[in-house]
A protein has these predicted regions:
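Polar/charged low-complexity regulatory segments
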Residues: 2-43, 47-48, 52-243
């Protein structure tokens, strides 16, 4: 899930909160779909795996995504709308997209992912920017410490700096718009699933390795807000610069 600068600004001026959609489909069993039907975003992949989005990942719309974000992850209307509107550049003429459409490089998908290879990295001759990379994930966990420490803004800042250096070494580039997306993407799971400023390590493993939101996330009805996400992005940059 990604948030562009333009859609963030629009979201901040989205007043009112329409009533949270009531679920009419309770078949949210986790059934992992094939990678051929998935994109580089583990969050949207998880929503499809759990039935909040069509399980085949096809013919999605921003409205469907917004409803899924509000239903499954209890996002506020401004946050869900801002995230779903960021998908507009990959829509077909009929207003739909498929999850694999998100693989298009430097539109929404971008370099410096925590768990995916950069598109043009020397060790990525096939330009595979969507497959989960276990070694990258282990490096991410190691940034938080050698034991079972949780993921915090401080450890995320360490990950952010490390991935920036690795990407630059491999020739990766980010424009201002995608830099903003990358900052908020780095803290997005913390905003969605964190408690007490921390992500429990087991939860993080479930999310990235299985592409599934654990019950403790979907059953936590606290509202996730756009301002909360932006605040965490600012704090991340503070840690990057000063910590």
């Amino acid at each position: 899930m990604h948030l562009t600068l333009t859609n963030t600004i629009r979201g901040l001026f989205t007043f009112g909160s329409p009533k949270k959609p009531e679920s009419t489909d309770h078949s949210y069993e986790y059934i992992r779909g094939p990678i051929e039907e998935r994109g580089p975003c583990p969050g949207l992949n998880a929503l499809a795996n759990q039935g909040y989005l069509p399980r085949d990942g096809k013919n999605l719309t921003p409205a469907l995504v917004s409803t899924a974000l509000r239903t499954a992850l209890h996002m506020s209307h401004p946050l869900a709308t801002s995230l779903s509107n960021s998908l507009k550049p990959i829509l077909r003429k009929d207003g739909t997209f498929d999850l694999p459409s998100m693989r298009a490089h430097n539109i929404i998908e971008h370099d410096r992912s925590i768990t995916r290879l950069d598109y043009s990295a020397p060790n990525n001759p096939t330009h595979d920017n969507f497959t989960f990379q276990p070694a990258m994930f282990e490096a991410f966990l190691a940034d938080a410490g050698p034991g079972e420490e949780g993921i915090t803004l401080k450890s995320l800042a360490k990950t952010y700096v490390r991935r920036k250096k690795e990407s630059k070494k491999d020739g990766g580039k980010l424009g201002l718009g995608l830099w903003f997306v990358n900052v908020l993407q780095t803290v997005s799971l913390l905003n969605t699933a964190g408690k007490g400023g921390e992500l429990e390590r087991g939860l993080v493993k479930t999310f990235y390795e299985e592409e599934r939101f654990p019950d403790l996330v979907v059953e936590d009805e606290r509202t996730r807000t756009l301002l909360g996400l932006l605040g965490k992005g600012v704090l991340l940059l503070w840690h990057v610069v000063f910590a």
